[in-house]
Amino acid sequence: MDKVLEITSNDHIIMINKLCKRILGHPEILGRIIKGFIKEAKDVSLEEIIELIKGKKDQEGNSYFQQLNNVIDIAHHGRVEFDYFCCINLPQDDGTMKRIYLDVEIQNVENPGYAPLTRGNDYLSRMITSQNGKEYDYRNYDGMKKTYVIWILPQAAKKRDGHVNCINSKLENISGSTIERLESYDKSEQIMISKRSMRVVIGSRHR
């Protein structure tokens, strides 16, 4: 009986995981995640982001949004499979465009034997490496685009329910007054959302 319960529980978790992955790609849901937690989206309305996800094109006929292959397999360095991997070009108030790469992960098990944020560092590095030869090369590293991993924990412990943490690169001025350009080092960010319902995605870090 215990074995039956274990199998039933595992099947239930797998079913939830698959359904959550399908939900993530819905423009209304993904749009709210981007608007709520991506810094580069602060100048763009939710309605416009949803239109970009739905397939809006620029004057040259290029899509602003792409759902990308969620598998990155680097020779001799293993394979990773993201839950939902995409990139989107976000218009800025100054007339420029910022492209970001985004992986949204549904993490049903809060503690799988390691810290999900540590796994996220691996994901971020692979997302950056996958841009080599496309966004940047050895002659122009400045073409590198910012990467995000957003973790959603729908079965977080009650004591963490509603908590949101952001982990990113910070500059520490040890000596002197030289300040490096933010664009030079602000290339990766993780956001951990511990929420027992998806309503958190309507929140915003830009308030």
Which functions belong to the PLM regions below?
Residues M1-R207:
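Elongated, amphipathic alpha-helical interaction scaffolds
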